[in-house]
């Protein structure tokens, strides 16, 4: 049969021929278009073609009523797939599966990239139903929306970066110009004048329907995107329910189980008795939402005979927006699945045993062995193939949600992957951007595959019970493989054997069997027996269990030894065995991979089990452990925690290489990674993505830490041991693995898995790590976190978990540091990593991470990690970092750790992490941990940390490291990657970047002095009076563009920056506050203040500091200075920290050597230049009035005379005294002075002694001193008097009011009120003759309801146009349009633009505002002088005429201007005609002028040839 694509037909064998198209495309009326003479736009043609070829909506059912497969492309309409409702799935029925939300465009002949490009550019006809309002593009984010479709380069592309869409012309926004420069040539005039935006709907993912299951034709996914491959829809053959021609509303497919009988699958037949338990059976119709490539069709056919587990509809729900899913239904399904599994399990056990034995015999961890095993596995070829198929690449991650699986997890026999499959999977991982995201729920809370009778319970984190979302794995629900590994029902004996049987001989497996049975059964039975386990911790998921699930594909060599019992014991043995193991197993990457997977997976189970089973297992462990070990079994994983380091290395490496493939498969396979969503096992996979690995390891560590706070100490140990093991025991091994991991991670999964994993792991780890970090922190700072630690359960589990987490953290941190060291020296990177990790941990303690930020960070981290540095550096850095971190962590006192670590780490890591590419992943994990630790540490710790950090900041990196480490070191290295993003240590604490972005070197300062003058005041009054220095107010008038100013959030962590930000409502105030650095959420104040002013600010600040002498180099963190420091930073910082980092980087790129960045060099530099910075900052700065005055001068909106001169908000008298300072400015100044920026609380107490403030204020890099009114420094007194003189001094209540949340509009209103009060302007108009009043310092525009111009008489216009065009050249003329600001006029102008732009050779400007200087009357003398000069000739006039200046402020008007140029006279005449038509309609609001340009030329040179050609022909022909 033919499945029709957009431009191609894929031949697919199918029982049903496609019936002809039954649907008309509602979007394009084909009659008009087919008959129109204009050539068809390819998009429209494509649409028509699609309609003609789209598959039939009514496929007759097969006569036998057996289920027939359908491809999504066959579903009713390719253009508009119906919205298949999840509602009509009855809760008791097995869930109806709807076709995938997107129907990928499978082009057999194009690469993914080209197909992607093509599909982006081709019209995907979306139903107008799904279009948001034409003025409100989805999320404002579409590439083409009503505003910018015509001009992809438009600055409105991302409408102001706001997260909420704005209608086009909210209040006085500029009139949008529609640039048709990229329009297809063949759309008709009507189509351009009334474009149908639905065609250009960029992205169905932005669909506003919550349960978007609509299929769209091309989602540019190719043959290999199969993660959503099988969605089961009960396909009704009843024509009533098939989508009818009316697509204007999505029709829901109805489930009619009576009409279609379920074809009983073979497995189903085997398990008929179990199927009775299912409440109802809905038809298992499989609709493939991809167009299978030919080589996959056979697999597909086979799959139809097996039970295919589709992705749960809710699988992706964690991605976010689709929260409307009926989670209760899923709960029920879970329960049902579990119960069915119990019964199913027994039948499959025998097979599993057989398989296990077979694997034990045949298993060699080599690829050839994999093939061999595959050959051994005749019985379930079909199932295996099906599994492979299901493993094909996941569809794009953003898929909203997939239907939940109807089938209870089908029991599949063990599946063996061939090398080609592994390769394919690897490739797929690399390919799909979110390879894991769809498949794997990383959170340890979503252990998906039921393993034993308790399987769900076992893998279900107790916390998950309340969170149905978490219950479903994000990815395809893994069908329960009855691999020995995945089958929860097989005997523990088998599981253990299989797990153990990495390389083991038969005898090994046998030997290990009894012990493993013991352990496995013990753990499993304990699970069953002790329901408490669920409550206490993730059910032990005995290592065996984990192994079972994690190594769902045992073939991949991911046999996990039953690490349950051994994990505790393994902690002890880890060092010993680690060496042996590394020596023993270096050859079997499979083993390593297994170990890593096992260990990662096992971290959770391990910690849990440890909690529950420590005593039991200790006795049991030793024998099996030694047996297994002797047999070269991969038991080292048994010492999951101990070996955790090894596996961590191996995880990073093997996992990255093999696990990326294997884990990918496993994930898809329902491998425990998926089913458990073990962050640990996932971590193994993530390790392939260096960035993610950080997070993952963090999550592992967190999970370990879940159990106990010991993690931090363990982390210390683990890091030490890790460094010991990694360095000493097996350098070559670690090297190989590091290389492998670097390669694999950067290559294979870096992007896809990193994003998915980062998301999943960020979530999972956020939970786990929150717990872990709180506990870890609790250990480190026993006092601060005593609360958190109190929760921790048994000692053994804490030990094991702490060790595992420490190992994971050391691993992650070492890897992160390795990456960082790729840039800085390995030594620097080690510091960086420890710093970064400590910072991450501090961050973790600092605040709960927002989901979005974690996602973003994960994305960034994946990118960064993929960029990861060379192996050597990674190795060295990992060692160094592990050493440093272990040292630091061991050393850190409980108190210092929480405080200093958060502070110092934030500072050091900020410096290092700004460099470290690993930033994001660490951020995710740290964020997760931050949640817990923030909870645990609470405010006291934040205060303490601020103090400690100020202390620590002065100290050497080692001190910082030590202090830092106490925070979960799990994050330590992880955080290294992620740090840059997280700028806040605590939700209350603000962290200072150790990496000073201020102008830090004397050379820089001197250069600035040289360039800017010592006062940085080269503009004197003029700059202050020019609105361009008042932050471009005239161009971005917030009064008319309120969306640019959102309401200020109350500054929570009030650094002086915060209070400033809240107080300095005025544009850039806070922007310049160095602390703004910590509020990386850069709210672009008014479209950003002019760069000049900001640079001046910075320079002045640095200058002032330098001059202060005590503080030669204050870190003026540029980025923060630029941000509107709204210091509820915990939320904002996460999002913008990456941005801030990049800003900082870019800022420093030129000025500083990268070495300066390395924490160490930077620190040394800073230490040399300044005495302990923290001290100098807090004390010297605060205390030296001199400095303060300079500082104030540096701060734009603080009123000092200098400031006033530079950027006065007030009307400056010509004498530059600026004594009439803006009331508002003064108020701001006072607020800034007064706000006690205390550490944890925003106090409105205006008067606070500066000393207290300095002590309290968290930020040690305070560029701006909190100047309280009590301050006696000269500058403040000057300010005080100035305020008195201005007569607008605020009362305290007024100030506190402003300090409280003021909307920008309110702020502007007050400011205007004060200004008006000065000039006694109350209401109404100001006389146009009173220039001083008119040109006061205000941000209001001159408003004109009517244009202050007369219409251009049409006759004159015609004559003027005729004259300009009479010589055959039109480039000496232009048309100027003036128009007022109103919605109606804006619409007219847009229409005019559109009409102009469909003509050739026309250039239209965007509407722009004008800035106006005050008028000035010249006296007779000046005019006489001018006349005299004029008489002397042009040169004299030019040379001798004096410049005249004014001392008022500029104003802008809301009259807008637009210019039109035409390249040829024909176009000029037509443009004039068009413009005049619109000007005549609104003569009082739109005025046209024609102007001639002396020596005019075309706007751009591309028209020159056209103009010349026209002119030559014109002249030639006119002579004829």
Curated annotation (Swiss-Prot):
Domain of life of the source: Viruses
Function: Transcriptional transactivator.
GO terms (BP aspect): regulation of DNA-templated transcription
Keyword list, A-Z: Activator, DNA-binding, Host nucleus, Host-virus interaction, Repeat, Transcription, Transcription regulation
Residue ranges of the region described as Interaction with human UBE2I: 1024-1072
Keyword flag Lyase: no
Keyword Transcription regulation attached: yes
Region spans: Disordered: 1-67, 115-162, 239-290, 340-406, 418-571, 583-611, 640-987, 1033-1278
Organism (species): Human herpesvirus 6B (strain Z29) (HHV-6 variant B)
Primary residence: host cell
Low complexity bias locations: 250-259, 686-701, 746-953, 1059-1076, 1089-1105, 1124-1140
Polar residues bias locations: 16-30, 50-67, 148-157, 239-249, 278-290, 480-489, 550-571, 600-611, 640-654, 663-685, 710-727, 955-973, 1158-1167, 1210-1219
GO molecular function: DNA binding
GO-annotated cellular components: host cell nucleus
Subcellular location: Host nucleus
Identification of the protein by name: Immediate-early protein 2
Quaternary assembly: Interacts with human UBE2I in the nucleus. Although this interaction does not promote IE2 sumoylation, it represses transactivation activity.
Family designation: Belongs to the herpesviridae IE2 family.
Pfam families: Herpes_IE2_3
């Amino acid at each position: 049969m033919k499945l029709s694509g957009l431009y191609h037909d894929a031949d697919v064998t199918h029982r049903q021929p496609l019936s002809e198209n039954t649907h008309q495309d509602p979007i394009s009326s084909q009659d008009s278009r087919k008959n129109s003479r204009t050539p068809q736009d390819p998009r429209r043609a494509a649409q028509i073609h699609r309609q003609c070829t789209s598959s039939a909506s009514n496929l007759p059912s097969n006569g036998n009523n057996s289920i027939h497969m359908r491809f999504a492309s066959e579903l009713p309409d390719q253009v508009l797939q119906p919205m298949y409702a999840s509602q009509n799935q009855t809760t008791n029925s097995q869930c109806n599966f709807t076709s995938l939300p997107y129907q990928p465009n499978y082009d057999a002949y194009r690469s993914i990239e080209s197909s992607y490009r093509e599909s982006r550019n081709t019209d995907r006809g979306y139903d107008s139903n799904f279009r948001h309002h034409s003025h409100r593009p989805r999320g404002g984010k579409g590439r083409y929306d009503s505003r910018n479709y015509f001009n992809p380069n438009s600055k409105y592309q991302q409408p102001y970066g706001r997260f909420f869409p704005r209608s086009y012309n909210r209040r006085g926004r500029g009139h949008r110009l529609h640039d048709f420069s990229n329009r297809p040539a063949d759309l008709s005039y009507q189509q351009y004048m009334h474009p149908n935006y639905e065609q250009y709907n960029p992205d169905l993912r932005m669909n506003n329907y919550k349960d978007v299951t609509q299929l769209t034709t091309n989602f540019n996914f190719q043959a290999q995107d199969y993660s959503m491959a099988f969605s089961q829809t009960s396909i009704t053959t009843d024509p009533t329910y098939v989508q009818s021609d009316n697509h204007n509303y999505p029709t829901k497919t109805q489930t009619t189980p009576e009409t279609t009988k379920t074809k009983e699958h073979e497995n189903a037949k085997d398990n008929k008795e179990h199927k009775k338990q299912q409440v109802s059976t809905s038809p298992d119709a499989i609709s493939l939402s991809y167009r299978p490539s030919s080589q996959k069709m056979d697999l597909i056919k086979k799959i139809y005979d097996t039970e295919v587990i589709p992705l749960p509809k809710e699988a992706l729900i964690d991605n976010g927006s689709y929260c409307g899913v009926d989670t209760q239904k899923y709960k029920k399904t879970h329960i049902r699945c579990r119960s069915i599994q119990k019964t199913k399990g027994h039948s499959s056990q025998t097979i599993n045993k057989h398989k296990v034995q077979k694997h034990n015999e045949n298993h060699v961890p080599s690829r050839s062995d994999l093939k061999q095993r595959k050959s051994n596995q005749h019985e379930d070829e079909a199932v295996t193939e099906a599994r492979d198929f299901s493993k094909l690449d996941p569809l794009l991650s953003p898929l909203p949600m997939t239907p939940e699986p109807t089938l209870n997890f089908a029991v599949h026999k063990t599946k063996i992957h061939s090398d080609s499959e592994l390769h394919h999977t690897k490739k797929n991982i690399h390919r799909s951007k979110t390879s894991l995201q769809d498949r794997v729920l990383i959170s340890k809370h979503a252990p998906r595959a039921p393993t034993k009778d308790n399987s769900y319970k076992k893998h279900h984190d107790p916390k998950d019970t309340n969170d149905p979302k978490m219950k479903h794995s994000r990815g395809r629900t893994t069908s329960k493989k009855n691999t020995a590994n995945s089958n929860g029902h097989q005997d523990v004996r088998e599981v253990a054997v299989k797990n153990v049987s990495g390389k083991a001989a038969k005898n090994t497996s046998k030997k290990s069997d009894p012990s493993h049975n013991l352990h496995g059964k013990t753990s499993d039975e304990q699970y069953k027996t002790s329901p408490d386990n669920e409550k206490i911790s993730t059910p032990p998921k005995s290592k065996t269990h984990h192994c079972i699930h994690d190594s769902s594909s045992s073939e991949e060599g991911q046999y996990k030894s039953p690490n349950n019992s051994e994990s505790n014991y393994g902690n002890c043995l880890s060092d010993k065995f680690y060496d042996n193991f590394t020596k023993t197993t270096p050859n079997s990457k499979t083993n390593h991979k297994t170990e890593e997977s096992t260990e990662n997976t096992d971290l959770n189970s391990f910690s849990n089990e440890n909690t529950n089973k420590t005593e039991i297992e200790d006795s049991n462990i030793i024998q099996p452990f030694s047996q297994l070990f002797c047999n070269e079994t991969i038991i080292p994983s048994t010492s999951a925690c101990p070996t955790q380091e090894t596996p961590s290395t191996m995880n990073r490496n093997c996992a990255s290489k093999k696990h990326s493939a294997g884990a990918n498969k496993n994930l898809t396979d329902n491998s425990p990674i998926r089913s458990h969503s073990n962050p640990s096992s996932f971590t193994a996979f993530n390790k392939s993505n260096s960035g993610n690995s950080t997070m993952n390891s963090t999550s592992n560590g967190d999970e370990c830490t879940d159990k106990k706070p010991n993690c931090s100490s363990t982390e210390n140990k683990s890091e030490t041991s890790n460094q010991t093991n990694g360095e000493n025991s097996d350098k070559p091994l670690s090297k190989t693995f590091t290389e492998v991991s670097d390669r694999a991670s950067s290559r294979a999964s870096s992007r896809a898995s990193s994003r998915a994993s980062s998301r999943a792991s960020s979530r999972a780890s956020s939970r786990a790590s929150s717990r872990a970090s709180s506990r870890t922190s609790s250990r480190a700072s026993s006092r601060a976190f005593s609360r958190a630690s109190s929760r921790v359960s048994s000692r053994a589990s804490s030990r094991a978990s702490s060790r595992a987490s420490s190992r994971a953290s050391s691993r992650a941190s070492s890897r992160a540091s390795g990456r960082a060291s790729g840039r800085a020296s390995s030594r620097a990177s080690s510091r960086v990593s420890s710093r970064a990790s400590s910072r991450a941990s501090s961050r973790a303690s600092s605040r709960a991470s927002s989901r979005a930020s974690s996602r973003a960070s994960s994305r960034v981290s994946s990118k960064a990690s993929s960029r990861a540095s060379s192996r050597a550096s990674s190795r060295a850095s990992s060692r160094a970092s592990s050493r440093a971190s272990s040292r630091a962590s061991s050393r850190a006192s409980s108190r210092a750790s929480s405080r200093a670590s958060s502070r110092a780490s934030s500072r050091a890591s900020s410096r290092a992490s700004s460099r470290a590419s690993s930033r994001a992943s660490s951020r995710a994990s740290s964020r997760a941990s931050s949640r817990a630790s923030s909870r645990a540490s609470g405010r006291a710790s934040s205060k303490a940390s601020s103090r400690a950090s100020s202390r620590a900041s002065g100290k050497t990196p080692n001190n910082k490291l030590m202090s830092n480490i106490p925070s979960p070191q799990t994050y330590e290295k992880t955080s290294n990657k992620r740090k840059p993003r997280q700028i806040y240590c605590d939700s209350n604490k603000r962290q200072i970047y150790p990496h000073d972005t201020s102008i830090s070197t004397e050379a820089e300062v001197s250069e600035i002095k040289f360039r800017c003058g010592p006062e940085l005041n080269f503009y004197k009054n003029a700059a202050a009076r020019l609105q361009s220095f008042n932050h471009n107010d005239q161009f971005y008038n917030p009064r008319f563009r309120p969306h640019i100013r959102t309401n200020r959030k109350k500054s929570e962590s009030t650094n002086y920056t915060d209070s400033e930000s809240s107080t300095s409502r005025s544009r850039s105030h806070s922007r310049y506050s160095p602390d703004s650095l910590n509020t990386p959420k850069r709210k672009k104040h008014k479209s950003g203040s002019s760069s000049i002013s900001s640079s001046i600010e910075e320079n002045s600040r640095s200058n002032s500091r330098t001059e202060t002498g005590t503080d030669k180099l204050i870190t003026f963190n540029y980025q923060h200075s630029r941000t509107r420091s709204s210091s509820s930073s915990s939320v904002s910082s996460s999002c913008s920290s990456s941005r801030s980092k990049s800003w900082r980087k870019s800022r420093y790129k030129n000025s500083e050597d990268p070495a300066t960045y390395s924490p160490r060099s930077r620190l040394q530099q800073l230490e040399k230049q300044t005495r302990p910075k923290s001290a100098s900052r807090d004390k010297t700065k605060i205390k030296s009035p001199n400095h303060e005055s300079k500082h104030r001068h540096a701060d734009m909106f603080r009123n000092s005379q200098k400031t006033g001169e530079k950027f006065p908000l007030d009307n400056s008298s010509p004498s530059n005294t600026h004594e009439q300072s803006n009331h508002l400015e003064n108020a701001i100044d006072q607020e800034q002075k007064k706000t006690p920026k205390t550490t944890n609380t925003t106090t409105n107490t205006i008067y606070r002694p500066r000393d207290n403030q300095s002590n309290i204020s968290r930020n040690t890099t305070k560029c701006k001193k909190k100047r309280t009114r009590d301050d006696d420094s000269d500058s403040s007194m000057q300010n005080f008097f100035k305020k008195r003189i201005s007569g607008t001094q605020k009362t305290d209540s007024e100030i506190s009011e402003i300090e409280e949340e003021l909307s920008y509009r309110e702020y502007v209103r007050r400011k205007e009120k004060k200004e008006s009060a000065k000039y006694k302007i109350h209401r109404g108009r100001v006389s146009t003759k009173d220039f001083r009043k008119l040109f006061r310092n205000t941000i209001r525009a001159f408003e004109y309801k009517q244009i202050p111009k007369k219409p251009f008489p049409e006759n004159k216009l015609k004559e003027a146009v005729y004259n300009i065009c009479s010589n055959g050249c039109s480039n000496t003329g232009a048309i100027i349009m003036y128009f007022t600001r109103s919605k109606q006029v804006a619409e007219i102008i847009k229409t005019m633009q559109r009409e102009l732009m469909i003509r050739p050779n026309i250039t239209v400007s965007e509407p722009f505002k004008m800035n106006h200087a005050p008028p000035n009357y010249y006296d007779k003398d000046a005019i006489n002088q001018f006349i005299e000069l004029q008489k002397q000739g042009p040169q004299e006039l030019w040379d001798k005429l004096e410049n005249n200046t004014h001392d008022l402020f500029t104003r802008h008007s809301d009259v807008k201007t637009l210019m039109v140029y035409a390249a040829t006279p024909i176009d000029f005449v037509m443009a004039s005609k068009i413009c005049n038509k619109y000007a005549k309609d609104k003569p009082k609001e739109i005025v046209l002028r024609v102007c001639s340009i002396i020596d005019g030329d075309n706007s751009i040179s591309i028209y020159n040839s056209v103009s010349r050609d026209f002119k030559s022909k014109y002249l030639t022909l006119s002579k004829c």
